[in-house]
A protein has these predicted regions:
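An alpha-beta-alpha
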Residues: 163-227, 246
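Extracytoplasmic "Venus flytrap"
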Residues: 48, 55-76, 99-105, 128, ...
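Short beta-strand elements at the ligand-binding edges of bilobed clamshell
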Residues: 100, 156-180, 222-224, 288-303
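Beta-alpha junction/loop-to-helix N-cap segments that form part of ligand/metal-binding clefts
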Residues: 66-73, 85-157, 166, 225-232, ...
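Extracellular/periplasmic bilobed ligand-binding domains
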Residues: 138-142, 207-302
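Extracellular/periplasmic periplasmic-binding protein-like sensory domains
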Residues: 263-342, 398-400, 404-411
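Bacterial lipoprotein signal-peptidase II cleavage site
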Residues: 18-32
Length: 413
């Protein structure tokens, strides 16, 4: 009898093992989640209200994962502040559909299609211009408007009729950093480094070069590195050998710390300038304990007490500190990243457009966006004919002592 029981137990264990193996899928799909009240099959939430879906198209993994998480926090806080909307006399619960586009342009279309299939009325994102351009084609075909948060390449909107954005553009940002390099450091020569195949970094580098040369400066070298590069010593030595006064290196967050740390190890004291993606704790941590001068251009500073900024900063910090996962996604601290403030503004802009349209239809919302003008945390927002926010100011911050300090407001010449 004991042998029979033992045999039966072994057979049961084997059966469970095969069932477990059979349930494992190797098909890779965009990572996704839904926030706020889950939608029932009827299209209503647990509260009984109808549901309006806003898609969040962001990199939660990959080279831009850290920045994508910070950018996602903005709409999440916006949804916390305003979780419902009135359309046609009815209350709708606003539900965020979050899909990970995994940073790269190759993954953009599948992540965008996932949002379309979920029935979103409008999309927010992405952190990263290349993936935004790739996803934009899908949104355009589906007739779903999108609001870029921190994607600064001009082609995001110029090549897509449904894309808007709340940030400034690379031609402006490149000009701002060129002016800063010349005014602050008296730079006459600059070395430029970007990542090959990355639309954001290559585009921003190009605009810096154009502005710097137009102002009479000399580019000693304009070089690119390939994805996965770990040793930047040859590039950094080229900057020194060329007699550069500054280094402009607008790379993804994944590479910036290595550039800073290796420059310090080589004893290079040249100021290193980055773009908006560099406003991340990984960069300030890399600078901490070194003498490196690291400066970034960005969209917002939490010390700004004008307009809606002070109220936003107070509420946002309380919200971050009330949830450990939010803090983790923000880099483990409650410093307000500029892309988070922009993300909040993008959410509120979308809500304002939907309220104006009084519709969940994408075309109606897109038309409402075109003529919209609102006061926002990062300044007033209205759009030009391309769908670009009209911006004329950038904030320069310095990475120092493990954080970022406001340095100055910089305009392009």
């Amino acid at each position: 009898m004991k042998k029979t029981i033992a045999l039966l137990l072994c057979l049961c264990m084997l059966a469970c093992l095969f069932v477990g193996c059979a349930s494992t899928s190797t098909t890779e799909k965009p990572t996704s989640e839904t926030t706020t009240t889950e939608t029932a099959a009827s299209g209503t939430s647990a509260s009984g209200n109808k549901v309006l879906k806003i898609g969040i198209f962001e990199p939660l993994t990959g080279d831009n994962g850290a920045g994508g998480k910070q950018e996602t926090l903005g709409p999440q806080y916006g949804n916390y502040v305003q979780p419902t909307i009135e359309i046609g006399g009815e209350t709708y619960d606003i539900q965020l559909e979050i899909v990970d586009n995994r940073t790269t342009a190759e993954n953009g279309p599948s992540a965008a299609s996932e949002l379309v299939n979920r029935g979103v009325s409008i999309v927010l994102g992405s952190y990263g211009s290349g993936v935004s351009m790739a996803g934009g084609k899908v949104f355009e075909e589906a007739g779903i408007p999108a609001i870029g948060i921190g994607c600064t390449n001009p082609q995001v909107t110029s090549d897509c009729s449904v894309y808007f954005r709340v940030c400034f553009l690379d031609p402006f940002q490149g000009s701002v950093m060129a002016s800063f390099a010349m005014e602050e450091f008296g730079a006459k020569k600059a070395y430029v480094l970007s990542m090959l195949g990355d639309d954001y970094t290559v585009g921003l580098a190009k605009n810096f070069v154009i502005a710097f040369e137009a102002a009479g400066g000399e580019i000693v070298a304009d070089e690119t590195f390939v994805e996965g590069t770990a040793d930047f010593s040859a590039y950094l030595n080229n900057a020194v050998a060329g007699g550069a006064d500054v280094i402009f290196a607008p790379s993804a967050i994944a590479y910036a710390p290595q550039i800073i740390e290796q420059a310090s190890a080589l004893g290079i004291s040249l100021p290193i300038l980055g773009g908006d993606t560099w406003e991340n704790s990984a960069i300030s941590d890399a600078q901490n304990g070194t003498d490196m001068q690291v400066f970034v251009s960005t969209f917002f500073d939490e010390s700004d007490e004008s307009g809606l900024a002070k109220e936003f900063v107070t509420g946002y910090k309380a919200w971050l500190n009330g949830n450990s996962q939010n803090l983790t996604n923000n880099g483990g601290n409650d410093v307000v990243a500029a892309v988070s403030a922009l993300g909040y503004d993008a959410y509120m802009t979308a809500v304002a457009a939907i309220e104006k349209a009084q519709s969940t239809d994408g075309t109606a919302i897109r038309d409402a966006l075109a003529g919209l003008s609102i006061d926002a945390v990062t300044g007033s927002i209205s759009f030009d004919a391309n769908g670009d926010a009209i911006k004329s100011t950038a904030y320069i911050k310095q990475a120092i002592d493990g954080g970022f300090q406001f340095y100055k407001v910089q305009n392009a010449d």
